[in-house]
Amino acid sequence: MAVTTLNKMADVLTRVNGNSQMASQCTDLANEVKAALQKYAVYDHPKYGKIYAYEVDGMGNHLLMDDANVPSLLAMPYLGDVDIDDPIYQNTRRFVWSKDNPYFFRGKAGEGIGGPHMGYDMAWPMSLIMRAMTSRDDKEIKECVQMLMDTDANTGVIHESFDIKDSMHYTRPWFAWQNTLFGELILKLVKDGKTDLLISCKK
């Protein structure tokens, strides 16, 4: 995210402010961070191959997990940080949406990624939204949209998190951030010509 933001800053500084010196500093720092990420943040996983680590310390230690909050590893293409077809991202995507991610939860009510501050078995709808946003697979997208509809506890809105065993147990009856992202997802799917997919989802 830092690399993407620094490059955007350089573009604004060049085209709007005319400050080529500061723009160059931003670009140099972006390139330095990008090189460091490739050197230190890529972990060769025995099951998934090369994946992006959630945290590194620059001394060879890696924290392998993902958190539902955006920015996240899952959301990197959505934020413009990597190409959706980047093989390391695709490996990472498989990792974070699996039991190998300590904060991925699956139960009879649904599945998704949560995070350390919500505790175990509480999945965030935001992770389902980001999974759909970063997918080219219509079946996967439909599964995400359907699950978002099925885990709203009959309220018609998206919550902060839901219990994977019983979605009637949730946190925050109204969570504007995720509801806004859900609206963005629906608009994206309509723009992408996937109205039939949306219509096929049942409530």
Show the residue positions of the predicted features.
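Active-site catalytic microenvironments for nucleophilic, acid-base chemistry
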Residues: 8, 12-15, 135, 188
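Heptad-repeat amphipathic alpha-helical coiled-coil interaction surface used
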Residues: 3, 10-11, 23, 30, ...
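C-terminal capping/lid segments that line or modulate ligand- or cofactor-binding pockets
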Residues: 63-83, 120-203
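Extended ligand-binding clefts on enzyme/binding-domain cores
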Residues: 1-4, 16, 23-124, 134-136
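Long alpha-helical scaffolds in large eukaryotic adaptor/regulatory proteins
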Residues: 13-20, 193
